[in-house]
């Protein structure tokens, strides 16, 4: 049980969806500096958020006792008596009602995927602003850490959580070849569990492939890159967050709702591989002239 004043954050979803909540959590921490923020979710993602100062501690979403909690029956001792909470749960009202009894601050339940046609990160910030006196920056990327190192290599992530979001393996191979012929002599590919499972490694034979052991290692790898190009995925959201110059390809999804945030991020929306490749080169040429 926590004796210090505590505030509960609950998010059990995918990495990219979780990162879209980070501007809201950042703004909340600014107005609640003396509270210990406890996260409930996937251990790997909670630990990552903790490494960026968004959480102080966490509880794995599969921990014993949480089933009754998510059913709105009882609060486990490990959670204690939070003074307030934000719950990103599809059906979170029962849990919210349970937490409101001992709370002195608002307990807010937010639908993770609302019907409103607005960017999710902005929607989350506005939802919190109706309960807490937070200040939302004009650019949500101002909530992200400053980039500390100059990159040494370019990275391509050819996968995502859905095959429909991806282009053909040949597209990424051609892209890597063209990058090497320009200003990026070192170009690597990021392979995670989804790529290992759904992609044919032979399609990338002879390429430099990185397989980060966890998302914290992935964050370190991305931080050291001078360029990142990927699809609509959690990896792309993390690249934008750590400040890597990022180009995100939206083959089937809408960046107006799900777009990666960051200080140097470009969205390209086109299902045609030739057009997408052309747009990438236009973006790189613009960045080169800008620098």
Which residues does each predicted region cover?
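Catalytic machinery of carbohydrate-active enzymes
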Residues: 1-291
């Amino acid at each position: 049980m926590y004796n210090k004043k505590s505030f509960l954050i609950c998010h059990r979803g995918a990495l990219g969806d979780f990162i879209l909540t980070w501007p809201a959590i950042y703004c909340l921490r600014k107005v609640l500096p003396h509270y210990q923020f406890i996260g409930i979710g996937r251990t790997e993602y909670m630990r990552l958020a903790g490494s960026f100062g968004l959480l102080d501690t966490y509880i794995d979403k599969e921990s014993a006792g949480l089933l009754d909690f998510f059913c709105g029956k009882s609060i486990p001792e490990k959670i204690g008596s939070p003074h307030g909470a934000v719950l990103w749960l599809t059906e979170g009202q029962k849990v919210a009602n349970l937490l409101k009894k001992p709370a002195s601050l608002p307990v807010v339940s937010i639908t993770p995927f609302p019907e409103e046609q607005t960017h999710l990160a902005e929607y989350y910030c506005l939802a919190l602003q109706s309960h807490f006196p937070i200040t939302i920056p004009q650019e949500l990327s101002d909530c992200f850490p400053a980039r500390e190192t100059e990159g040494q290599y370019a990275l391509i992530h050819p996968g995502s959580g859905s095959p429909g979001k991806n282009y053909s393996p040949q597209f990424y191979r051609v892209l890597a070849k063209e990058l090497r012929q320009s200003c990026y002599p070192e170009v690597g590919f990021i392979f995670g569990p989804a790529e290992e499972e759904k992609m044919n490694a032979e399609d990338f034979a002879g390429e430099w492939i990185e397989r980060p052991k966890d998302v914290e290692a992935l964050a370190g790898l991305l931080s050291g890159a001078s360029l990142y190009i990927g699809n609509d995925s959690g990896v792309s959201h993390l690249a934008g967050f750590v400040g890597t110059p990022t180009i995100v390809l939206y083959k089937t999804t809408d960046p107006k709702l799900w777009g990666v945030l960051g200080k140097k991020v470009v969205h390209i929306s086109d299902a045609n591989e030739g057009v997408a490749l052309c747009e990438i080169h236009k973006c790189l040429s613009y960045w080169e002239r800008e620098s």
